[in-house]
Regions:
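Conserved beta-strand segments of alpha/beta enzyme cores
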Residues: 29-31, 111, 147-150
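Active-site segments of SGNH/GDSL-like serine hydrolases
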Residues: 71-75, 103-134
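Catalytic His-Asp segment of secreted/periplasmic serine-dependent ester chemistry enzymes
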Residues: 120-169
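Conserved SGNH/GDSL esterase-like catalytic core that processes O-acyl groups on lipids
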Residues: 2-90, 94
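Hydrophobic/aromatic beta-strand patches that form the interior of the parallel beta-sheet core
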Residues: 4-6, 113, 149-151
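Conserved beta-strand termini and adjacent loop/short-helix elements that scaffold enzyme active sites
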Residues: 33-35, 115, 151-156
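Charged helix-capping and loop-helix junction motifs
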Residues: 88-100, 129-136
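Structured segments of extracytoplasmic/periplasmic soluble domains
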Residues: 12-13, 17, 21, 57, ...
Length: 169
């Protein structure tokens, strides 16, 4: 049994914070497969191989399920990465295709979770648009394979006081 977080800088800094605040005992049964500034192409070319290796390692130690939590998407929704706007609908479809295939390929003793892309403050990061994030999240939530449980951090944060620059326009 164990937990694997797969993601980008949000996952990387979550790992760093847990280690700094609580020490290595807090993450003894937690693996982090992450790379800052990356997204789906990194996952397909490097991250997935590491994730599968971690799944096999954790499954060999226990007969309990491994939880795999995906936290990817925000970097692929940045116009910095494309130079001239983002095909956010295409990005959502690419994620759906890969994640749904992955859900079929992985052992049934993996529990799959997908964490929504969090809201962004567009005053500080104008390269991302809230409407595109919401589309991406809504699309994934409604069309991911049923093996995935959706973790809606976006709505939780918006409901509990996080605000974005767009709200003030």
């Amino acid at each position: 049994s164990g937990i694997i977080f797969v993601g980008d800088s949000r996952t990387y800094f979550m790992q760093k914070t847990l280690l700094r605040e609580y020490g290595k005992d807090a993450v003894a049964k937690v693996s982090f497969v992450c790379k800052t500034g990356e997204g789906l192409s990194w996952f397909e070319t490097a991250g997935e191989r590491v994730m599968r290796s971690e799944i096999a390692r954790l499954q060999s130690d226990s007969d309990k399920p491994v939880a795999v939590i995906f936290n990817l998407g925000v970097n692929d929704l940045s116009s910095h990465n494309s130079g001239n706007g983002v095909d956010y609908k295409g990005e959502a479809n690419a994620y759906l295709a890969r994640m749904n295939t992955l859900a079929e390929e992985l052992e049934s003793d993996c529990r799959l979770f997908y964490m929504s892309v969090n809201p962004v403050n567009t005053a500080m990061k104008p390269t991302r648009k809230e409407a595109q994030l919401r589309y991406f999240n809504d699309r994934l939530q409604s069309r991911l394979n049923k093996r995935f449980q959706w973790i809606d951090t976006y709505k939780y944060l918006m409901k509990n006081g996080y605000s974005t620059y767009n709200e003030f326009k």
